[in-house]
Amino acid sequence: MTPINLMDALAKRLQDLLTDYTAKQPSGTVPVTVYPGYIPVQNNAAEKKSFVYVLVVETDDRAGNDKSIAVVELGFSIYDADGTDGWRSLYNVVEHVRQDLLKFRFVNMKFRLDLEKPIVFKVPENQPFPQWQATLTATYTIGQPEEEGFNYDDFQEVQAYGQYEEYKNH
C-alpha cells in the first residue's frame, strides 16, 4: 500500500467520476483526462487539454501510529474559452470531485480520507486563460509496516539491566 498505489487508485476513480465532463476545443469536444502522478510532457501546444493530476506530495510516519498518512494534491486545469463565465467550469469539476471524496472516503478499501486534516481548495489569482487552474489537497491514511528485528517488550525482562551499560551513553 504505497503512495503509488494510492495515486493509481484515486486517478482511476476520478477518471470514472469525470467521464461526463468535457471541454469544448476549436477541434471539438475533448474529455477531461486524469493522470496519476505528474502530467506527461505536452509536445503540442496548439490545444490545451483539460486534465486532473493526482500526486502524493508528502508522507508522514510517526511512532505509535498503526497508519501513516499521505498528503495528496489534486491539480485541475480546465479549458474554457468563455472570458466571462469560464471559471465556472473549473469550480464545477472541483466541487464534483470534492463531494465524491467526502461521500466515499475509502479508496479501494485500502486508503481512507483523514478528515482530522482539512481538505484545502486553492485557486491561484493569476489564471493562464483559457485554462482555469486550482488545487485540492486531501490527506489519506496508508498502511505502515511493522518494525522488525528487535522485541522491545523483552528488552529489560529477559536479561539483567546491568548487561546494558553500553547503551546508557548512546
Enumerate the language-model features and the residues they cover.
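Generic marker of residues within folded, mature protein domains
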Residues: 44, 64-66, 124-128
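Small/polar-rich, solvent-exposed N-terminal microdomains that initiate assembly or binding
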Residues: 1-63, 154-170
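Acidic-leaning, charged glycine-interspersed low-complexity segments
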Residues: 91-149, 170
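Active-site-adjacent structural patch at catalytic or cofactor/ligand-binding sites
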Residues: 54-82
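Short, cysteine-centered beta-strand-loop-beta hairpins and adjacent loop/turn segments enriched
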Residues: 61-64, 79-85, 141-150
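Residues at beta-strand starts and edge strands
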Residues: 48-50, 68-72, 128-136
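"Short basic amphipathic alpha-helical interaction patches in structured regions
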Residues: 66-72, 86-95
